[in-house]
Regions:
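DNA major-groove recognition helix of helix-turn-helix/homeodomain DNA-binding modules
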Residues: 52-66
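A detector for short, charged/polar N-terminal pre-domain segments
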Residues: 1-8
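Recognition helix of helix-turn-helix/homeodomain-like DNA-binding domains
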Residues: 32-46
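Short, conserved catalytic or interaction motifs in soluble domains
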Residues: 43, 62, 69
Length: 71
Protein backbone atom coordinates (compact mmCIF):
# COMPACT_ATOMS: atom_id res chain seq x y z
CA UNK A 1 0.00 0.00 0.00
CA UNK A 2 2.67 2.51 1.03
CA UNK A 3 4.68 1.76 -2.10
CA UNK A 4 1.56 2.20 -4.27
CA UNK A 5 1.21 5.80 -3.09
CA UNK A 6 4.86 6.51 -3.82
CA UNK A 7 4.58 4.92 -7.27
CA UNK A 8 1.49 6.94 -8.21
CA UNK A 9 2.96 10.16 -6.83
CA UNK A 10 6.20 9.60 -8.74
CA UNK A 11 4.28 8.91 -11.94
CA UNK A 12 2.33 12.15 -11.56
CA UNK A 13 5.51 14.15 -10.98
CA UNK A 14 7.08 12.59 -14.08
CA UNK A 15 3.96 13.21 -16.20
CA UNK A 16 3.83 16.87 -15.18
CA UNK A 17 7.58 17.31 -15.73
CA UNK A 18 7.39 15.78 -19.21
CA UNK A 19 4.32 17.88 -20.10
CA UNK A 20 6.51 20.90 -19.49
CA UNK A 21 9.34 19.37 -21.54
CA UNK A 22 11.78 19.54 -18.64
CA UNK A 23 14.67 17.16 -18.12
CA UNK A 24 15.21 15.84 -14.61
CA UNK A 25 18.22 18.14 -14.31
CA UNK A 26 16.34 21.26 -15.45
CA UNK A 27 13.45 20.43 -13.16
CA UNK A 28 15.74 19.76 -10.19
CA UNK A 29 17.42 23.14 -10.69
CA UNK A 30 14.07 24.92 -10.71
CA UNK A 31 12.85 23.00 -7.64
CA UNK A 32 16.11 23.47 -5.75
CA UNK A 33 16.82 19.77 -5.25
CA UNK A 34 19.37 17.36 -6.70
CA UNK A 35 18.69 15.58 -10.00
CA UNK A 36 19.13 12.16 -8.42
CA UNK A 37 16.46 13.05 -5.85
CA UNK A 38 13.95 13.70 -8.66
CA UNK A 39 14.82 10.34 -10.22
CA UNK A 40 14.36 8.59 -6.89
CA UNK A 41 10.93 10.20 -6.43
CA UNK A 42 9.83 9.26 -9.94
CA UNK A 43 10.95 5.65 -9.36
CA UNK A 44 9.25 5.53 -5.92
CA UNK A 45 12.57 4.96 -4.16
CA UNK A 46 12.29 7.95 -1.84
CA UNK A 47 9.67 8.90 0.72
CA UNK A 48 9.31 12.60 0.00
CA UNK A 49 8.87 15.27 2.68
CA UNK A 50 6.06 17.80 2.73
CA UNK A 51 8.61 20.57 2.26
CA UNK A 52 9.89 18.95 -0.94
CA UNK A 53 6.36 18.27 -2.17
CA UNK A 54 5.77 22.00 -1.91
CA UNK A 55 9.00 22.77 -3.82
CA UNK A 56 8.05 20.32 -6.56
CA UNK A 57 4.50 21.66 -6.92
CA UNK A 58 5.82 25.22 -7.09
CA UNK A 59 8.45 24.28 -9.69
CA UNK A 60 5.78 22.54 -11.80
CA UNK A 61 3.37 25.47 -11.30
CA UNK A 62 0.63 23.16 -10.03
CA UNK A 63 -1.27 22.87 -6.77
CA UNK A 64 -0.07 20.27 -4.30
CA UNK A 65 -3.49 18.62 -4.59
CA UNK A 66 -2.92 18.18 -8.35
CA UNK A 67 0.00 15.89 -7.58
CA UNK A 68 -2.12 13.70 -5.32
CA UNK A 69 -5.42 13.62 -7.19
CA UNK A 70 -7.22 10.42 -6.16
CA UNK A 71 -4.26 8.64 -4.60
Amino acid sequence: MKKDVLIKFGQRVREERLKQKLSQEEFADIAGVHRTYIGMIERAEKNITLENIQKIAKALKVKISDLFGDL
